[in-house]
Regions:
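Long, charge-rich, low-complexity alpha-helical segments
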Residues: 1-13
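Short, motif-level signal for alpha-helix interfacial/capping segments enriched in acidic residues
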Residues: 3-6, 52-56, 62
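Canonical Radical SAM [4Fe-4S] cluster-binding loop centered on the CxxxCxxC motif
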Residues: 11-51
Length: 215
C-alpha cells in the first residue's frame, strides 16, 4: 500500500505567540483588554515553569520539522517580568532542540520599562526583533499607558529604548490609536520617526476607553 501523498507541499513555518506571564503586567493601561484577565491566573505571581518552557520549545521545534526557520515569539502581559535568566534558558533550549540546518528567529513585544544594558546586550547577541509599545510624545503616551500607581510610563519607555538603540538592537514601534492621539497622527508619526528613529511602525486602533478622551 502506497504512502499518503504529500498534498500539502514542503513544511512551512508558522507564528505562535507565547505569554509566559499570562496577563500579568507592571503597567495598568486603561485600554488594555487583558487587565481583567490577571485575576483568572493562579496565585499572585503567575510564571511559566521551566518544565513547561522546555516542553513548549521542544514541541514548537518538532512542529517545524523540515522547515528552515522557527519563530520564537514572546508577548504578555509583560514578558520581561520573567527575568533575563528565563530567556537565557529559552535560548539554550532552542539551541538544544533545533534540527540541523534550522535557525531560530526571536521576537518579543515589551513595554520597555524594565530594559537595561544587560537586556539590550542579550537581545543583540541573539538577534531579537524587539517590539516597543509607545503611543507618541509624552502627553499622548501617558494619557493611558500608566503604571499601577497611575503615573505615566513615558520616561521609563524612552530609557529602555535608549538601551536598545545604543546596543544596535533591531526594534519596531507598536502604537495604539486611541482618543488622545487619534487626531494627532502626523505628530505621532514624526515623533516616532525623528525622535525615536523608528524604521517600522504599527498603528493599532483600540476600543473600550472613553471616546471623549482620557480620564
Amino acid at each position: 500500500m502506497s504512502a499518503v501523498p504529500d498534498v500539502l507541499g514542503p513544511p512551512r513555518a508558522f507564528h505562535l505567540l507565547a505569554k509566559p506571564t499570562g496577563a500579568v503586567c507592571n503597567l495598568d493601561c486603561s485600554y488594555c483588554f487583558f487587565l481583567s484577565k490577571e485575576m483568572l491566573y493562579p496565585g499572585s505571581r503567575f510564571r511559566m515553569a521551566e518544565d513547561l518552557l522546555e516542553a513548549y520549545v521542544r514541541q514548537l521545534i518538532e512542529a517545524h520539522a523540515g522547515a528552515p526557520e522557527v519563530a520564537v515569539a514572546w508577548q504578555g502581559g509583560e514578558p520581561t517580568l520573567m527575568g533575563l535568566d528565563f530567556f537565557r534558558r529559552s535560548v539554550e533550549l532552542v539551541d538544544e532542540y533545533l534540527q540541523p540546518g534550522q535557525r531560530a528567529a526571536y521576537t518579543i513585544q515589551t513595554n520597555a520599562t524594565l530594559l537595561d544594558d544587560e537586556w539590550a546586550s542579550f537581545f543583540k547577541e541573539h538577534d531579537f526583533l524587539v517590539g516597543i509599545s509607545i503611543d507618541g510624545p509624552r502627553d499622548l503616551h501617558d494619557a493611558y499607558r500608566v503604571n499601577k500607581g497611575g503615573k505615566g510610563s513615558f520616561d521609563q519607555v524612552m530609557g529602555g529604548l535608549s538601551f536598545l538603540r545604543s546596543a544596535g538592537v533591531d526594534w519596531n514601534a507598536l502604537t495604539t490609536v486611541h482618543a488622545a492621539n487619534g487626531d494627532r497622527g502626523r505628530e505621532v508619526y514624526r515623533f516616532l520617526r525623528d525622535e525615536c528613529d523608528a524604521r517600522f511602525i504599527q498603528f493599532i486602533p483600540t476600543g473600550g476607553c472613553d471616546p471623549t478622551g482620557p480620564t
